Amino acid sequence: MAINLDGAYLTIRESLRHMPVQEWGRVLAVSSIAGVRGLKGAHAYSASKHGVIGMIRALCADHAKLPVTFNAICPGYVDTDIIDRNTQSISERAHISQEEARALMVDLNPHGRLITADEVASAALWICGPGSDSFDGQAMEISGGQP
């Protein structure tokens, strides 16, 4: 909770000190699909990521007069080193191999694959770009349609 929610809050709070003097700005927080849908067995993680989304929406309402947008990205399972740690944890708890645990994550994505870091980065670049002025107070899912 302290890293996911408090860390995001403290970082955003400091960045807001500089926003009013600029002509426009973007605040983008990283949440998770778990913050949108909840994740079985990960109550605190899901709650902290849901808190990030709530904070972003409240900041959007509070600072609507600033030329700043507030959004969150909510990736599903992204093919990174974190997946290896997750598959190890799942395999130990479920008494299955790490390959089977990874396959479970892949199966959650209707595209039949993990999300790539480049896909997340592309979404973040669009949200932070000059053509996204009306995209504000949103939690963008980057999950391949993961339920």
For the regions a language model picked out, list residue spans one by one.
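Catalytic Tyr-x(3-8)-Lys segment
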Residues: 88-118
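Residue(s) in the substrate-gating loop at a strand-loop-helix junction
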Residues: 32
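Catalytic Tyr-X3-Lys loop
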Residues: 1-10, 24, 28, 52
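Active-site loop-to-helix junction immediately N-terminal to the catalytic Tyr of the SDR YXXXK motif
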Residues: 38-46, 58
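C-terminal substrate-recognition "lid" of short-chain dehydrogenase/reductases
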Residues: 10-12, 16, 24, 111-142
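Short, small/polar-rich loop/turn modules that mediate ligand/substrate recognition or access, typified
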Residues: 64, 69, 135-137
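Short, flexible catalytic-loop segment of classical short-chain dehydrogenase/reductase
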Residues: 70, 75-85, 89
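Active-site helix of classical SDR
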Residues: 12, 48, 56
